[in-house]
Amino acid sequence: MSVEQSLLGKETEYPTTYSPSVLFPISRDAAREKYAQIEGISQGKDWWHVFELSWLNSDNIPQVAIGRITLPATSPYLIESKSLKLYFNSLNFHVFASKQELIDLVEKDLSQAANAKVSLELFDVDSLEISKPSGMCIDDLKPERLESHPDASLLKLDANEQHDADVTLYSHLLRSNCPVTGQPDWGTVFIRYTGRKHCYRSILAYIISYRQHNGFHEQCVEQIYADIWKNLQPEKLMVYATYTRRGGLDINPCRVSDLSWMPNPIRLARQ
């Protein structure tokens, strides 16, 4: 099925009974074809936070929690976000004898949709703390050149620095558009690398160039990862984006060249 057949951007009735059939998988293959030779492009995880998660206990009393879904980047499919929202809404009036029963059912349904092992972790509503970003913020730098669409030629090494570096950079200025609805997506992107020192102004210019780009969160992160890997040739690389929520969900894709560089998932203030 193509994304045009999904419920994104369409008026939809919200199910009030358990409805796993609403889940809409989207193949990762088409977006990855041009990155087939990029090391690590399918290595990492997609973390989703579910803020509108509710069900009934055995006494028919509503329960609430925050959920964290972990979807491996190796999965053949990602799950379209509106369908995931509808799926979780369909659980609002479903009775579960325990939290574990809920977890087991959700993991089964999402794993089937993604054709890979998906996990769910539950948090009390006041226990998922907000973290502060770590690393060097590059948002106050002045780019030499600005473009309105992603342009890998913006990426440059630092001509004045020959020594290798192990650096984590981040920017709050990531913006792209949903490819179906055209709605803006906002995020913070973290870039960690080892190798020849990058020109940080060029990286900021490259991030800003996504502001009119149409792409799903996961696809944007993989394009950023691929362009840095190809153009700047780091020894190791991590790209991790924490997007703001929409419809009670936020999406946080991470791609790494080395699994030892997988960060712990975080929640930032804008989420």
Curated annotation (Swiss-Prot):
<comment type="pathway">
    <text>tRNA modification; tRNA-queuosine biosynthesis.</text>
</comment>
<protein>
    <recommendedName>
        <fullName>NADPH-dependent 7-cyano-7-deazaguanine reductase</fullName>
        <ecNumber>1.7.1.13</ecNumber>
    </recommendedName>
</protein>
<dbReference type="GO" id="GO:0033739">
    <property type="term" value="F:preQ1 synthase activity"/>
</dbReference>
<dbReference type="InterPro" id="IPR050084">
    <property type="entry name" value="NADPH_dep_7-cyano-7-deazaG_red"/>
</dbReference>
<comment type="similarity">
    <text>Belongs to the GTP cyclohydrolase I family. QueF type 2 subfamily.</text>
</comment>
<keyword id="KW-0963">Cytoplasm</keyword>
<keyword id="KW-0521">NADP</keyword>
<dbReference type="GO" id="GO:0005737">
    <property type="term" value="C:cytoplasm"/>
</dbReference>
<dbReference type="Pfam" id="PF14819">
    <property type="entry name" value="QueF_N"/>
</dbReference>
<dbReference type="InterPro" id="IPR016428">
    <property type="entry name" value="QueF_type2"/>
</dbReference>
<feature type="active site" description="Thioimide intermediate">
    <location>
        <position position="178"/>
    </location>
</feature>
<keyword id="KW-0671">Queuosine biosynthesis</keyword>
<dbReference type="InterPro" id="IPR029500">
    <property type="entry name" value="QueF"/>
</dbReference>
<comment type="function">
    <text>Catalyzes the NADPH-dependent reduction of 7-cyano-7-deazaguanine (preQ0) to 7-aminomethyl-7-deazaguanine (preQ1).</text>
</comment>
<dbReference type="GO" id="GO:0006400">
    <property type="term" value="P:tRNA modification"/>
</dbReference>
<comment type="subunit">
    <text>Homodimer.</text>
</comment>
<keyword id="KW-0560">Oxidoreductase</keyword>
<dbReference type="GO" id="GO:0008616">
    <property type="term" value="P:queuosine biosynthetic process"/>
</dbReference>
<dbReference type="InterPro" id="IPR029139">
    <property type="entry name" value="QueF_N"/>
</dbReference>
<dbReference type="Pfam" id="PF14489">
    <property type="entry name" value="QueF"/>
</dbReference>
<feature type="active site" description="Proton donor">
    <location>
        <position position="185"/>
    </location>
</feature>
<feature type="binding site">
    <location>
        <begin position="246"/>
        <end position="247"/>
    </location>
    <ligand>
        <name>NADPH</name>
    </ligand>
</feature>
<feature type="binding site">
    <location>
        <begin position="217"/>
        <end position="218"/>
    </location>
    <ligand>
        <name>substrate</name>
    </ligand>
</feature>
<feature type="binding site">
    <location>
        <begin position="79"/>
        <end position="81"/>
    </location>
    <ligand>
        <name>substrate</name>
    </ligand>
</feature>
<dbReference type="InterPro" id="IPR043133">
    <property type="entry name" value="GTP-CH-I_C/QueF"/>
</dbReference>
<feature type="binding site">
    <location>
        <begin position="81"/>
        <end position="82"/>
    </location>
    <ligand>
        <name>NADPH</name>
    </ligand>
</feature>
